[in-house]
């Protein structure tokens, strides 16, 4: 049986830390079963996290469903066209927002040509969990790519709901979503975690999540858990728990009945 977990505010706190209780539960689970991540985070971040905690993590859905991996092999991609990506970046820059793109190995690209290096350094200090950024400008980098883009990310300090609606009107042919209280991300139309799941070599799984972008999986899988801090609208789609460890414990007890 496969157990899939969302990362931010489900398995991992805002500092990127996983509790000892959750870590030990995952170790016990993976002695007999499979485990994986389902997240808006990029693949490089997920690989580093799995390595840090020494998780056996064969399945990964990353970038809000833009990519799916099985045993480190990319089995599915849903990517933004490069020309469209460049045009969207130019529109977003008019709003003076902190925009960035993360490549396949975890390098991040910022509008350094438009905003300057001082603003980049200020942003790095403001969001240290993102790590270091390249000195190459985001538009210059996208112009040099051959593959499409998994997602565009924006850090939004104020007026998130207002900006979310404006970008949804502006980019009607793309998925525009708030992935946290201060982030808006854009992916290709039709991209979601459930669509990515359907391309993994597995028919069923247990899933735990806490966000609106988890709803597509919560609605489609039978065996689901929702974190107790999740919006009330999500709680009807799974068993409410306080931690990943609690969900794994419930599943383990089912096996022993």
Where are the regions that the model predicts?
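Asp-based phosphoryl-transfer active-site loop
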Residues: 1-16, 218
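Residue-level marker for buried hydrophobic side chains located in beta-strands
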Residues: 3-5, 60-61, 207
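Short active-site oxyanion
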Residues: 32-36, 56-58, 150-151, 203-205, ...
